[in-house]
Amino acid sequence: MSFFADLPKDNKKCIKIGSPLALSLSDCLACSGCVSADEAGALSEDLSFVLDLSPQTSFVLSPQSKINIFNLYREDGMEYREFEAVLSSFLRSKFNIHRIVDTSYLRSKIYEETYREYMATNHLIVSACPGVVTYIERTAPYLIGYLSRVKSPQQMAFSLVKGSRTVSVMPCQDKKLENGRDGVKFDFILTTRGFCKALDSLGFRRPARASGKSLCSMEEAETTQWNIGTSSGGYAEFILGKHCVVETREIRNGIKEHLLDDGRTISQITGLENSINYFKSSKTKGPRHKMTEIFLCKNGCIGGPGQERVNDVEMDIREYDRNGREQPRIFYSSPGLEEKRVFREVKAKRVDLRVDW
C-alpha cells in the first residue's frame, strides 16, 4: 500500500512490483510504514542552494560523506587532511560561509552523555540512525522507552550553525527524517551523492592541491576528529573501553556480543535483516543485553545508500580506518547541548484498505 500514490519517484521502481520480498536500504519503504516516512523527500535532492551563493551559509558534513568524496575526487598522492583543506577552501570561495562543521567534532560530548545514560539504566538501545528511530516509533513502540535520548551528531551540529542558511551532507536519505523534530531545522539535507552533484555544478571536478596557508586556516570544528570503533560512531567501543571485556563473540555477520567482567553484555548490530530480527525478538523477550548499538546499514554509516559508489565500500572503510589511526584525538565544545531527543509512537495512517501487490 503506497501512502504517496501518483508522486514521481525519479524512475525508481516500487519494491512491490515483481519481487515483493527483495528489500534493500535504497528502496522506498513507506508502503510498509516502517523506515521511511517521507517517500517524496527521500527520493529527491534539492540543490537549489547552488543557484544563490550570496546568503550566509553553514555546512554540516559527516566524516563518512567526506571520506567517500575524498575517494571520488582526490589526486594521486593526496592525503585526506590535505583534501579536507581543499574542500573547505572551495566552499569558502563559492559561498558566503558562516561556518563549516564536521559532525565528529561533537563525538566526545555524545560519548559522555551516552555513558551517563548507560550507567543509569538496565537496558539501552543506542542509535544515531533515524531509520532505527522511525521503525521503532511506527512498528516497535514497545522499545521506545529503551532508546537513548542523546541527540545524533547531525542534531547536535545544528546547534552550532543555526541562524544562517544551513546545508547538511549525510551518507543516507533517512537523515532527512531528523529534520523538523527535536529543535532541528536544516534548510537542506543532502546525501553524499546529491552533494557531489552540487560540487560538480560548481566546478569541483579536479581539485587543486592545498597550500600550506589553506591547511593552517581551517578551524578545528571543520576537520574530522576521528572516533574510536566503527564508522557509525564508536558508541559501544567508548563504553567497552571503560570496562574489562572478558569475551567477544561474532554471532553472525553484522552481530557482535561483548561479555563484560560484571556479567553484562553489550551487543552491536548492523544490517536491515539483523535489525528487524532484533526488533521482533525483543517484542516477546524484551531487550536481553545491557546495551545494544544498532544501525540499519550493512557496513554501518560508511555504507549508507546515499554514498556515491564508484568505488567499493571496502575502499571507504579502509581509508576511514587508516585516517582514524592517524588522528587519535577527539575535540569538542559544549555549547549547551543537553537537550534530549523526544520519541513518540506514530500510528500508521492508511489511505484505504486496498493493498496493491
From Swiss-Prot:
Q: Where does [4Fe-4S] cluster 1 bind?
A: C14, C28, C31, C34
- UniProt-listed Pfam families: Fe_hyd_lg_C (PF02906)
Give yes or no: UniProt keyword Nucleus. no
Q: What is this protein called?
A: Cytosolic Fe-S cluster assembly factor NAR1
Give the GO molecular function terms: 4 iron, 4 sulfur cluster binding; iron-sulfur cluster binding; metal ion binding
> What family is this?
Belongs to the NARF family.
Any one GO biological process: iron-sulfur cluster assembly
What organism, scientifically named, is this protein from? Encephalitozoon cuniculi (strain GB-M1)
Keywords assigned by UniProt, alphabetized: 4Fe-4S, Iron, Iron-sulfur, Metal-binding
